[in-house]
């Protein structure tokens, strides 16, 4: 059963059913759209379906490895693409200087920055740390589900615009959990902007639960973040 049907969100279920219906018609009887023109909302969804179908498909698994300084140009390009995406969707996250080259140089030096490569090219990036996160100790409006000493923390994850919609972000989350387990973590924590719908859907899809709110250090921007956690079994 698709995960959306288990969630019980009627609006999401209805949107999923509408998309399924349009995809079937587009595949088997596209002529029906001439007989009964789609509504404006259906047309926008059809345009998105066509864009998704035109995207390249992953034909082999990506490779996850620790990033090196040679990866910096590709990492910074991916971050800029993510920054542009967030700007278009009016999400006040990564809209200032953070994260920048110094941020990722520090991550690389610490051995916490990882990349996913596909057919030899960097396609995604994330940082995974295992030290207690001071900002997370000041969680409000909720509580963590695990103790801080045994939690991994996901930071700065982004996927190349060339590979959005291909499932690469889901593979990234699988690698995050694999690395966390191998390091002995009992949980993975992460935070994101409350308006970052794409990231929140990704987290929910992988079983992360909202735990409360924190304040991040992103000078000149909205510091409020929603915090999520997944217990590793």
Spans of features found by a protein language model:
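A short beta-loop-alpha structural element at the N-terminal edge
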Residues: 63-77
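Conserved acetyl-CoA-binding loop-helix of GNAT-fold acetyltransferases
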Residues: 159, 165-178, 201-205
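Conserved active-site alpha-helix within GNAT-family acetyltransferase domains
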Residues: 170, 182, 194-212
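Conserved GNAT acetyl-CoA-binding A-motif
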Residues: 173, 180-192
């Amino acid at each position: 059963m698709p995960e959306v049907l288990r969630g019980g969100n009627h609006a999401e279920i209805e949107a999923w059913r509408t998309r399924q219906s349009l995809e079937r018609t587009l595949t088997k009887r596209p002529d029906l759209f001439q007989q009964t023109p789609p509504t404006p909302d259906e047309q926008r969804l059809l345009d998105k379906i066509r864009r998704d179908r035109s995207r390249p498909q992953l034909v082999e698994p990506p490779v996850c490895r620790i990033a090196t300084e040679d990866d910096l140009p590709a990492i910074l390009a991916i971050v800029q693409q993510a920054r542009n995406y967030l700007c278009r969707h009016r999400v006040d996250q990564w809209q200032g200087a953070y994260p920048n080259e110094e941020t990722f140089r520090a991550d690389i030096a610490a051995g916490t920055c990882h990349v996913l490569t596909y057919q030899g090219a960097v396609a995604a990036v994330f940082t995974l740390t295992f030290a207690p996160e001071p900002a997370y100790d000041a969680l409000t409006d909720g509580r963590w589900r695990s103790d801080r000493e045994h939690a991994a923390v996901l930071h700065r994850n982004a996927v190349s615009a060339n590979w959005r919609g291909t499932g690469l972000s889901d593979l990234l989350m699988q690698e995050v959990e694999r690395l966390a387990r191998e390091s002995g973590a009992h949980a993975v924590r992460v935070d994101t902007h409350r308006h970052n719908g794409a990231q929140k859907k990704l987290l929910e899809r992988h079983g992360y639960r909202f735990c409360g709110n924190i304040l991040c250090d992103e000078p000149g921007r909205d510091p409020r973040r929603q915090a999520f956690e997944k217990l590793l079994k």
